[in-house]
Structure formats: C-alpha cells, structure tokens
UniProtKB/Swiss-Prot annotation:
Name of the featured protein: ATP-dependent RNA helicase DDX3X
N6-acetyllysine modification, residue list: 55, 118
InterPro entries assigned to the protein according to its UniProt record, in alphabetical order: DEAD/DEAH_box_helicase_dom, Helicase_ATP-bd, Helicase_C-like, P-loop_NTPase, RNA-helicase_DEAD-box_CS, RNA_helicase_DEAD_Q_motif
Residue stretches of biased makeup (Gly residues): 623-634
Reaction catalyzed: ATP + H2O = ADP + phosphate + H(+)
Length: 662
C-alpha cells in the first residue's frame, strides 16, 4: 500500500510540475509580460496574441473579438472566439438565424423555438453586438422562416372603400396635415418594407391622421374603435422614430446597470393595455413591424409565469407591451426602469380606468422615474372618451391633439345590426336556428354575460353536435390561448365568450356576432359588435332582446338610427313610452353618439364647431356636443330605475325570420 501511495505522490508531483505555475518561459512565446501568470492547458504553446486574461474585463477574451463583448466581460470559447458565435453561446447568431425569434414571450405552444441559441442564458444579442455603434435605420438580413411565421396570415378581403365615408375630427393647435398614403411621410426603409409584407395598401382614417401627428412628436388623444387600425397607427411612427434615433441613453444605462440577466431593462417605448389578450395582440403586431430591425419587443401580463417573462426581459427590451398590474410588479422587482421611456401609449384607456387600473397607471406615469409630460410623448387611444376621462388626460398629455374617428362598422354600415325579441326560455332554440342559417364554416362569436353561462352554453352546443369552444376570465391563460387558436383556425368555428374577449381582440373573418345576453351598457355593445366587420369587411350582428334589457333601450335605439339600421317598431314604442316622454326620437340632448363619434373634445365649447375633417355622414339630426359627456360614468344601468319589467312578455314574437334579411 505504501509503495502505491509513493507512486501516486510522485505522479501528482509530476503533474503539478507540468503545470509550471511559477514559470512561463517556455509558454506564450517566451513573453516576459506573462511571467507569473497562470496559463490554462488548452492555451499553452500558443502565441501571446491568440488569447490572454484581461484583468479589466474579468474574463478570458480574444483580441480580435474583444470589441464585441468588452462591455459584457464575457469569455471566449476554446478557439479564442467570442461565445456570441458559439452554438452554446448565451446569445443568438444574430436576430434572424435559422431558429428565428418565434417566441420571445414564451406564450402559446411554440415555446421550444426561442431563437437565442441552443441553450438560452439571457443573452442579449441585439444589444451587445455593437448595436450602439450600428445604424439602427438599416435593415438586418431577411429570414424566410420568420417572415413566413409573421406575415402568412395576410389581410384579405379588406374593403377600404367603405372607409371613405367615415368622419374624422382633429382639434388642437397647429394640427399636422393628414396623409393619403404611407409614402407621404418618411418612415424609413424597415417600416416601409414591413408595411408591404403586411399587405397594407393604404392607411385607414385613424392612421391617416395619427401617423403624421405622432411623427411630429405631438401628444395625441384618439377616439377610435378597435378594428380601425389604431394599433398600427401608433406602432408605425413610434418604431420609425426609434429606428431613426437609435437606442440612445437607454442602451448605455442597461449596460452599466448589471451583468447578463441581472441587468435592468430600460424600454424606449411603453404600451399599456387593459387585458392580456390585447397586450399579446399588440405585441404580435410589434413583432411584425420590428422585423429586420434591432428593436426587440417584449410583453408582460398577469396570469402567466412571471419567471418566464423575467427571463424574456433579460434578453433585452426596447418596446414593452404590458398590463398595468404586472408592470408595477416588474418595476418593484427592479427588472424595468422607465428613466429613458420616450413614448407612452395608453390603449383602451377607458377600459383600463373602468377596470380600476387608475392607481397603477398613476404609479407608473407620475410616481416613478418616467420622464414628465412634454419630455416624453404620450398617446391615448380608446373607442370612447367620456368627458371625465378627457379631463383626466390633462394630467398625462401636453398640448395634445384630439382625434375623433367615427365608429367603424356602425357609421360606415359595414355591420348589419339586427335586434330580435327573444324570451329567456327561447334563446337556445333560437340560437340553433341562427347557427344553422349561418353555415357551419362561418366564424360565429356568441356573447354571454356570465362565466357559468359560457360554460353551460358551450356544453349545450357540444351535445347538439356543434364544434365550439369558450373563453372567459376563469380559464387559464393556456386554455384561453388554445380556445382562440381553435376559433381562429376554424377547427371550432363557434366561440362562446364573456366580456373578456369583447375588448381589443383582433379575430379576423368573424362573420356573425350574436349577443345571446345583451350587455348592460351601450359601450360594451359597440365593442362586441365590433368583433365583426373589422377593417372594412362586412359582418352581421344579432342581439337577443327581452325585458331584462330595457335599461339600454334608448341608447340602442340611438345607435341603430345613426347607423341607418332597421329599427323594430316595438323598440321604438318601448323607448317612447319609457324614456322620451313626448320628445321626438333621437333628439335627446344627452346623446352620446352625436355626429357619429364616440366622443368629442371637451376643450371645445358646446356651440363651437371643431370639425376639420368630416364627411356628409358626420352630420346628424341629433344635437348636442357632449358625446359621452354624461356623469353616469361606467358600469351601465343608468336608466334602469325608470323601467319595470312587466307588460312586454311575448308580445313581439311576430317578427318571424325575415329579420335576417333573407
């Protein structure tokens, strides 16, 4: 045993001697500069210039690649080559390698194709490869796979001619002139190429006015409904400016803040949305318009794994889409800093306040490090802007321009609206008749009021042999995304939904919206029927009405008259008997749909004319300049106290089937 121990000891001595920790005369080309320096075995007997240990960068580096990662202190692989180019590197080979960037947010079922090398370690490829030195306005090489993924959906069947009749108002000092074509304003090579890939032929009304306003760096409050193209209206000019200006101080602050995944991210643009579905939708649009650029969009929202979202942020974030609650969480965790946020967008602003997000919004905008108004550029978009919310906008916007765009669908008559008296007990059988008449392959969206009602109706339709699915707030994020995927793809052409899907979801080719249960306020009705007839396409909206819905009689009547829709005689009689009390139909001073707009600029006096851009359709027999200026606020049911529920049972079933227009 002792003999073996002696041999082992000798063997170890020989091995340590081979390491030669104290002498490097025979290594590194005999350089005296390296005397006393430990040389790893795999780098011995090489020239000094091949590799060295840099005390300043705290890591092994190669001289030729030192510039690429000097700020990161990264180490090279065994060939002296930066790990940026290694299969196991912490960053991708570039933004458009063969793995692409398919799933930055980790949502959906494609999470295995992340696009950041085989082993993701929080690498930040677009922010570290000299991205502060490169020209951000120049497009990166194309990726056929990513291009197919982002743009294969296409925009088919768009009826832009219908948009010509939509009225538009712009009020404010020195309003920039609107454009007629995307080429009328300089947005750069990247944006114009992506516009061509999305097959946008010409801007929608809200884009015609909003794009030049934002390009002029003016604050904007736009009253425009979802489906009008408002998402692109703010993404296009914001991204164009980022490409033109570059990352600026945000990149330097990110590098100085920490190393690798511990870095706080400083987005250049922030978009706030009320729901996770709308946030994901905006993020997907941002991915399209940031294709072939160095801008990396990210999305964070509640109801999903925060760890995955943090890992996604750690790879870099220039444009952030977020729900208010989750963003506050990220800020308190030290993952997001708003010090260099140049562009702030509040999408569906009325909905966010309605959902109680005002404290979080004020926390984000006013009580943190976000630049003040006048320094940052702020945009608010929504389908309606009551006077109370316009007054609130004074705290966020500086010398803003108010843009009111007529409601897409109702004003342009793209959506045929039908209101049918159906007793509560007859709704299911009537729904089956509608589904049979619509056709099996047509996408049909059925709205109900409660989560329990959604599950019950889905179960009923399933047992009746219909391919259907449902979505509501109690479903997990994965279940909701899967339901939307099944619906969009046509595998389940019937989607039963609560109000969670009514706001902002961009589901193309929905042919029929059915209000199985009418909402309690007219704004929710406008959003629901806006799921069909989107972006100029034609659609049909059918609503089941009975004594439970008397509270919206007046507003529903006003909306149908304005949109030049057929008004059932029983609805006129009901509105006359229970609310108007002798005043002529449609002349209520409190009409919230005055002139075809969801709201008007409260800064304009009630007698002043503020219409700079309008069509003949904007004129109306109804008067009143308040738009949605009543003091009722949100929640609906404002007129519920004026009505009782008796006297209407079954007296209006004589409509037959000709309501469908056949």
């Amino acid at each position: 045993m002792s003999h073996v121990a002696v041999e082992n000891a000798l063997g170890l001595d020989q091995q340590f001697a081979g390491l030669d920790l104290n002498s490097s005369d025979n290594q590194s080309g005999g350089s005296t500069a390296s005397k006393g320096r430990y040389i790893p075995p795999h780098l011995r007997n090489r020239e000094a210039t091949k590799g060295f240990y840099d005390k300043d960068s705290s890591g092994w580096s190669s001289s030729k690649d030192k510039d690429a990662y000097s700020s990161f202190g990264s180490r090279s692989d065994s060939r002296g080559k930066s790990s940026f180019f290694s299969d196991r590197g912490s960053g991708s080979r570039g933004r458009f390698d063969d793995r692409g960037r398919s799933d930055y947010d980790g949502i959906g079922s494609r999470g295995d194709r992340s696009g950041f090398g085989k082993f993701e370690r929080g690498g930040n490829s677009r922010w570290c490869d000299k991205s502060d030195e490169d020209d951000w306005s120049k497009p990166l090489p194309p990726s056929e796979r990513l291009e197919q993924e982002l743009f294969s959906g296409g925009n088919t069947g768009i009826n832009f001619e219908k948009y010509d009749d939509i009225p538009v108002e712009a009020t404010g000092n020195n309003c920039p002139p609107h454009i007629e074509s995307f080429s009328d304003v300089e947005m750069g090579e990247i944006i114009m190429g992506n516009i061509e890939l999305t097959r946008y032929t010409r801007p929608t009304p809200v884009q015609k006015h909003a794009i030049p306003i934002i390009k002029e760096k003016r604050d904007l409050m736009a009253c425009a409904q979802t489906g009008s193209g408002k998402t692109a209206a703010f993404l296009l000019p914001i991204l164009s400016q980022i490409y033109s200006d570059g990352p600026g101080e945000a990149l330097r602050a990110m590098k100085e803040n920490g190393r690798y995944g511990r870095r706080k991210q400083y987005p250049i643009s922030l978009v706030l949305a009320p729901t996770r579905e709308l946030a994901v939708q905006i993020y997907e649009e941002a991915r399209k318009f940031s294709y072939r650029s160095r801008v990396r969009p990210c999305v964070v929202y509640g109801g999903a794994d925060i760890g995955q979202q943090i890992r996604d942020l750690e790879r870099g974030c220039h444009l952030l889409v977020a729900t208010p609650g989750r963003l506050v969480d990220m800020m308190e965790r030290g993952k997001i800093g708003l010090d260099f946020c140049k562009y702030l967008v509040l999408d569906e602003a009325d909905r966010m306040l309605d959902m109680g997000f005002e404290p979080q919004i004020r926390r984000i905008v006013e009580q943190d490090t976000m630049p003040p108004k006048g320094v940052r550029h702020t945009m608010m978009f929504s389908a309606t802007f009551p006077k109370e919310i316009q007054m609130l906008a004074r705290d966020f916007l500086d010398e803003y321009i108010f843009l009111a765009v007529g409601r897409v669908g109702s004003t342009s008559e793209n959506i045929t609206q039908k209101v049918v008296w159906v007793e509560e007990s007859d709704k299911r059988s009537f729904l089956l008749d509608l589904l049979n008449a619509t056709g099996k392959d047509s996408l049909t969206l059925v709205f109900v009021e409660t989560k329990k009602g959604a599950d019950s109706l889905e179960d009923f339709l399933y047992h009746e042999g219909y391919a259907c699915t449902s979505i509501h707030g109690d479903r997990s994020q994965r279940d909701r995304e899967e339901a939307l995927h099944q619906f969009r793809s046509g595998k389940s052409p019937i989607l039963v939904a609560t109000a969670v899907a009514a706001r902002g979801l961009d589901i193309s080719n929905v042919k029929h919206v059915i209000n199985f249960d009418l909402p309690s306020d007219i704004e929710e009705y406008v959003h629901r029927i806006g799921r069909t007839g989107r972006v100029g396409n034609l659609g049909l909206a059918t609503s089941f009405f009975n004594e439970r819905n008397i509270n919206i009689t007046k507003d529903l009547l006003d909306l149908l008259v304005e949109a030049k829709q057929e008004v059932p005689s029983w609805l006129e009689n009901m509105a006359y008997e229970h609310h108007y009390k002798g005043s002529s139909r449609g002349r209520s001073k409190s009409s919230r749909f005055s002139g075809g707009f969801g709201a008007r600029d409260y800064r304009q006096s009630s007698g002043a004319s503020s219409s700079s851009f309008s069509s003949s359709r904007a004129s109306s027999s109804r008067s009143g300049g308040g738009g949605h200026g009543s003091s009722r606020g949100f929640g609906g049911g404002g007129y519920g106290g004026f009505y009782n529920s008796d006297g209407y049972g079954g007296n209006y079933n004589s409509q037959g089937v000709d309501w469908w227009g056949n």
